[in-house]
């Protein structure tokens, strides 16, 4: 249904289908089972990313800036989405979720000078799903 709605509405969806270095490392062979859907997404004119990193949730909050910097330096060329759940937790946030420290660590990593400098030094281009969709429209299926 997720793929179907994305295609029908021409809304970009999270579809990793390139080299899948981190996606395979984190999710094993189940990533390969997505291939038929990825071909369908691309053929329908939607963007497909090269890789997906989801492992940062297990990083200790204090180590996130350094770990993210190392990850950025190790990325292969292409489009990689790195999932974070950045938040400035309120007083009640810990009552809603046990991940408030992790989310605060995500925010601190994403706004750190270390990560900002790494992005600049590695010539990493930050992008949005809208920009990916605009680029995809310029490419033939």
Predicted segments with their positions:
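C-terminal domain-boundary segment and adjacent tail
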Residues: 96-141
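Short secondary-structure boundary segments
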Residues: 52, 84-86, 130
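Catalytic grooves of carbohydrate-active enzymes
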Residues: 69-95
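Structural recognition of the beta-strand scaffold that forms the well-ordered cores
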Residues: 12-15, 81-83, 127
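Flexible loop/turn segments at secondary-structure boundaries
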Residues: 22, 90-91, 135-136
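Catalytic domains of cell-wall/extracellular-matrix polysaccharide-remodeling enzymes
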Residues: 1-66, 73
